[in-house]
């Protein structure tokens, strides 16, 4: 059986699982893992096929969620960034008894633009899939540059993301394509109306991948959830605003 790479740090009485985004790995959390592990029992995970979780092909969202759950604590706060937000949301939908609270970061229940729904144009995602076959390292780097564009610290934030990617072997092209397919096709807007656990959604005002226009739309669709926008962040608020980010999670811990 293929194994998910999993690291546990800290000894807090609440478990917190962090799920990274497309093309990346758990090293992306190194800017906040020391701070968070002083408040939580922290679980860092490489999603199947990414980072050190080798031997997986392209998976559906449901299969990715089930693979991650195999090694997870019985109950935890699940936090997912970008693509990881869809994985955490899927777990909240299928195994609500395992989810103490759900946190999504710069994530959308439907990344792809639809009628009257802001998102990434489908042809942009299809273009990324095509370019992966031609020059996948450059394509991943372009995607990372998009994630930090517009912030005051854009250049150093992009460098931090690139360093994370290059620290470990690149994922296989079919795994990267599978992740883009999830971003292109999945729509959890309606299902997530039914989750009852505490649900916190974090966004960057300058995010070029998850438009801030979705925030009030989801506030209305999911009145049981809470949203917070980092005024000067883009797609990676935990890199550009680590102290503020950790503060929000510690405050959530007091409420669950």
Swiss-Prot record:
pH dependence: Optimum pH is 8.0-8.5. The activity is more than 90% in the pH range from 7 to 9.
Activity control: Strongly inhibited by phenylmethylsulfonyl fluoride (PMSF).
Main enzyme class: hydrolase
Residues annotated to bind substrate: 22, 82-83, 143-147, 235
Active site: 82 (nucleophile), 207, 235
Protein EC: 3.1.1.85
GO molecular function: carboxylesterase activity; carboxylic ester hydrolase activity; pimelyl-[acyl-carrier protein] methyl ester esterase activity
Record keywords: Biotin biosynthesis, Cytoplasm, Hydrolase, Serine esterase
Transmembrane segments: none
Catalysed reactions, as listed in the record: 6-carboxyhexanoyl-[ACP] methyl ester + H2O = 6-carboxyhexanoyl-[ACP] + methanol + H(+)
Subcellular location(s) per record: Cytoplasm
Protein's pathway: Cofactor biosynthesis; biotin biosynthesis
Keyword Transferase appears in the UniProt entry: no
InterPro entries the record matches: AB_hydrolase_1 (IPR000073), AB_hydrolase_fold (IPR029058), BioH (IPR010076), Carboxylesterase_BioH (IPR050228)
NCBIfam families from the UniProt entry: bioH, PRK10349.1
Family recorded in the similarity comment: Belongs to the AB hydrolase superfamily. Carboxylesterase BioH family.
Subunit structure, interactors included: Monomer.
Descriptive protein name: Pimeloyl-[acyl-carrier protein] methyl ester esterase
Native species: Escherichia coli (strain K12)
